[in-house]
A protein has these predicted regions:
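Membrane-embedded alpha-helical bundles that constitute the cytochrome b-like, heme-associated redox core
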Residues: 1-214
Length: 214
């Protein structure tokens, strides 16, 4: 089953979900490691091998980050076109509202983190290229230290929002699985059977438009 139903996530949604999750758990440690290398090089200097390793780590980080960006945009477009399976806790209005906000905060940060990183990359030059054939610069971004500094800071802020929303998202999934003992987590995995419908909730399109308005 490729598409969503009122009670089940389809294979395409699951592939988007787990591809993005895998990318997140790669890109964040790479960013931390790259920053640590950069700070060590700035503070103490380094040989050519260490500089080359830092450039490799940052290039990998940027390339995975842009892959996540375009995958997240495709995921959002797919969600708009699909019915959203009804929440298994739809009768718990406050909990359901909080889970929805965390979910779309997560997706908003999945867009904003790589976009701000991309702008920062475009405002600088000569270090750690993105591994793709489409060029390194955005046409509207000047080469500017102040622009680079601004978007570097925003990149860090949104990265922290991403981490916080990710932790809350995982905690909510575990709460459903361990405490509520419902199928919320299982139905996002492959090969699980559909569950019965629950109380009515807002569509994916409404949630996305609300998130974009924020």
């Amino acid at each position: 089953m490729l598409s969503n139903t009122a009670s089940h996530y389809g294979t395409i949604t699951k592939l988007f979900h787990w591809t993005i999750a895998f990318g997140i758990f790669l890109v964040i440690p790479l960013g931390i490691y790259g920053n640590n290398l950069a700070h060590a090089i700035e503070a103490n200097g380094a040989d050519a091998q260490t500089v080359a390793r830092a450039a490799f780590v940052f290039s990998l980080h940027k390339t995975i980050g842009l892959t996540i960006l375009f995958t997240a945009l495709a995921r959002i477009a797919w969600a708009i076109s699909q019915p959203k399976p009804e929440a298994l806790n739809g009768d718990k209005k406050a909990e359901h509202w909080l889970a929805s906000m965390i979910h779309w905060l997560l997706y908003g940060s999945l867009v904003l983190v790589p976009v701000t990183g991309w702008i920062h990359h475009s405002a600088t030059s000569g270090f750690a290229p993105i591994w793709w054939p489409f060029g390194q610069d955005l046409p509207f971004v000047p080469k500017s230290d102040s622009t680079a500094h601004l978007f570097e800071g925003l990149h860090v802020v949104f990265e922290r929002v991403l981490v916080a929303s990710l932790v809350l998202h995982i905690a909510g999934a575990l709460k459903h699985h361990v405490i509520d003992k419902d199928a919320t987590l299982r139905r996002m995995w492959f090969g699980t059977t559909a569950v019965g419908p629950r109380p009515q909730q807002h569509s994916a399109k409404t949630a996305i438009l609300a998130a974009l308005a924020v």
